[in-house]
A protein has these predicted regions:
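N-terminal signal peptide c-region/cleavage motif recognized by signal peptidases
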Residues: 18-20
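C-terminal edge beta-strand
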Residues: 179-190
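Hydrophobic helical h-region of N-terminal Sec-dependent signal peptides
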Residues: 9-15
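Catalytic-core regions of glycoside hydrolase
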Residues: 199-473
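Bacterial N-terminal signal peptides that target proteins for export
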Residues: 1-9
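Extracytoplasmic low-complexity repetitive segments enriched in small/polar residues
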Residues: 69-74, 83-85, 190-192, 254-261, ...
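Catalytic domains of carbohydrate-active enzymes that cleave complex glycans
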Residues: 277-284, 290-303, 307-343, 348-365, ...
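Ligand-binding face of N-terminal immunoglobulin V-set domains in extracellular IgSF glycoproteins
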Residues: 24-181
Length: 582
């Protein structure tokens, strides 16, 4: 109690110091949660106040500070976060806090009628990055006159953090002058999230185009593997499993009917991510493992017999390593009716190699592929017909139709795409209400997909690419409009030293990637509650927010209310279970 009183007194004195002795001009500032996208001209709220957050151990939780000054531009603006101090002297070190500058992208075309042109926040430039721990040049910055500047503040709560109430301060400076001291409170629940996502993911990443964006051209395979490693690690830190990488399959020799595969370089690339050593004890999410990995095949496998032998070696190797349950064979992407016979033949050939090789196809359930498909991954639009709109999918297959496949130990994944906003068009009424990863949509749309995955009992989420805009000559930091959407297929931006400072190349995360991770963390709450009770208990919480695949509450306050109530319920039931155990 004395410690809490002392901290409160210190905070009060600091705030008095700011109000009496800060250099002019003083800022207008406010805080928001992570589900508000603040535009440059948004009107500041009338009340300045700090923020209160809630999180489990081994969870990231973010908020935003927005700065503005209408009288003049202000140079040398910086933000520093203190340690978070909690019960009985517990401390969450400020080294677990990352401060990001939110850069605006000027969008020239809307993604849909729900979108909009103008400046939207999305690229995040760290003050000190989590990958190389280098100070970057986004801070200090000049606060432009008459414009809002949002800052993303990300707190990681380490495993085994003592539950309870924590307090900290975010100090805003201009040069050496303190302009604001913003109180931050964090309540840590009595439970912990796992490091590895309970919902499987496979998000595409093309290391070849990433290298070209960072180096200007393809240089060599070592550089290709290196840039792929840092992006794959970045994805894992966001609870996402990347597939593709350098796109280099392990080499083989084929002599006298025998197939030999050299796994050395491949295992060095993927092994740490599959074994849980890519993120060590000193990293967030220690021991996190990727939940999926794709089979890479060779163009030089010129006969079916060679393909069968090569794929069989994949299964043997992955079985020996304990990785087999996460291996999938991406047979075909959105095949047409005319392509179905060929797709079925390729899938059957993979099963000829070994029936344990899981074949994935992005298609609704169809008799044309009956038999050799193990992972059905239809478009989210293909589960339900939206009333008043023409069917986007042919066919639309309801979720219950997949139940016989699940009883046969098959899996159902899904994905969202340009069908959420309109493919190469400004989408109309049909293209509203769906979960979406474009920039110019409400933040809840970027976060809600895992909630729907729980509601519909979906086993995994597929996404075609996280760096699609890297394939063009244009700088992704200036334009990520593709397939009719702003940011469609692009969740990262290239962090080049000549642009962001430092000595090393890193991926820059997007606000949307942060929100995807928030949704995956929400999913863990559903798992925890269902483990304490049953699945129906978690369903009731999800149903408060999600009605169907195209209808959910877009209001940030609704999501945060449900999440807080859900966390309190998990804590209450956990206490009750521990009490019965005693």
């Amino acid at each position: 109690m004395t410690s809490l009183h002392t901290r409160s007194l210190i905070l009060l004195l600091l705030m008095l110091l700011v109000s009496r002795g800060s250099a002019k001009p003083s800022f207008t500032w406010w805080t928001t949660n992570a589900l508000v996208k603040t535009m440059p001209s948004d009107v500041p709220p009338s009340i300045q106040q700090g923020i209160t957050l809630h999180a489990a151990s081994n969870e990231f939780e973010a908020f935003q500070i927005v700065l503005r000054n209408d009288s003049a531009a202000v140079p040398d603006v910086d933000v520093e976060m203190s340690d978070l101090t909690g019960p009985s002297g517990s401390v969450i070190s400020s080294s677990n806090v990352t401060v990001y500058f939110e850069r605006y992208l000027n969008l020239s075309r809307p993604s849909s009628i729900d979108g909009g042109v103008g400046e939207w926040p999305d690229p995040l430039i760290p003050r000190v990055d989590r990958y190389e721990h280098e100070r970057r040049n986004a801070f200090p910055f000049t606060l432009a006159k008459g414009r809002n500047q949002p800052l993303w503040i990300e707190i990681y709560v380490p495993p085994k953090t003592r539950p309870g109430h924590y307090q900290a301060q975010a100090t805003v400076l201009s040069g050496s002058a303190i302009q604001a001291v913003i109180p931050v409170s964090l309540d840590v629940w009595e439970f912990e999230l796992p490091s590895t996502s309970s919902l499987r993911t496979a998000f595409g990443f093309n290391g070849v185009i990433a290298l070209k964006q960072h180096a200007g051209r393809y240089t060599n395979d070592d550089d290709l593997r290196s840039i792929s490693q840092v992006y794959t690690r970045a994805a894992l830190l966001h609870r996402v499993s990347a597939f593709g990488g350098p796109l280099i399959p392990p080499p083989f020799t084929h002599k006298a009917g025998a197939m030999t595969v050299d796994w050395s370089l491949y295992d060095a690339e993927v092994g740490p991510f599959l074994n849980g050593t890519a993120l060590s004890k000193g990293d967030p999410l220690p021991g996190a493992r990727t939940t999926s990995v794709e089979l890479r095949t060779h163009g030089s496998l010129d006969t079916d017999k060679k393909k069968v032998l090569y794929w069989r070696e994949w299964v043997r190797h992955f079985d020996k390593k304990g990785w087999l349950s996460r291996l999938f064979n991406y047979v075909s992407d959105e095949p047409t009716a005319a392509q179905m016979p060929g797709v079925k033949k390729r899938a059957a050939l993979a099963h000829e190699a070994d029936h344990r090789l899981s074949n994935l196809v992005t298609s609704p359930l169809t008799r044309a592929l009956d038999g050799p498909i193990d992972i059905w991954s239809p478009l989210i639009n293909c589960f339900e017909t939206k009333p008043g709109s023409p069917d986007f999918c042919e066919p639309t297959v309801p979720r219950r139709a997949y139940d016989p496949e699940i009883r046969r130990h098959k899996s159902v994944w899904w994905y969202q795409s340009c069908a959420s906003h309109g493919c190469n068009i400004v989408g109309g009424e049909y293209f509203t209400g769906w979960p979406s990863y474009v920039i110019d949509t409400g933040a809840v749309s970027n976060r809600i997909m895992p909630w729907m995955s729980w509601k519909y009992r979906i086993d995994g989420e597929l996404y075609y690419n996280m760096v699609e805009a890297y394939s063009r000559e244009a700088d992704p930091l200036e334009d990520v409009f593709l397939h009719g959407g702003n940011g469609d297929g692009t969740l990262f931006y290239p962090g080049r030293p000549n642009a962001i400072g430092g000595a090393t190349h890193i991926p820059l995360e997007s606000v949307r990637l942060k929100l995807i991770r928030e949704g995956l963390e929400d999913y863990e709450y559903f798992v925890l509650l269902s483990n304490l009770t049953d699945s129906a208990s978690a369903d009731r919480w999800v149903d408060k927010l999600v009605h169907n695949t195209y209808t959910f509450s877009p209001l940030p306050e609704d999501l945060y209310r449900v999440r807080q109530e859900l966390g309190d319920e998990i804590q209450r039931r956990g206490r009750a279970m521990r009490g019965r155990g005693n």
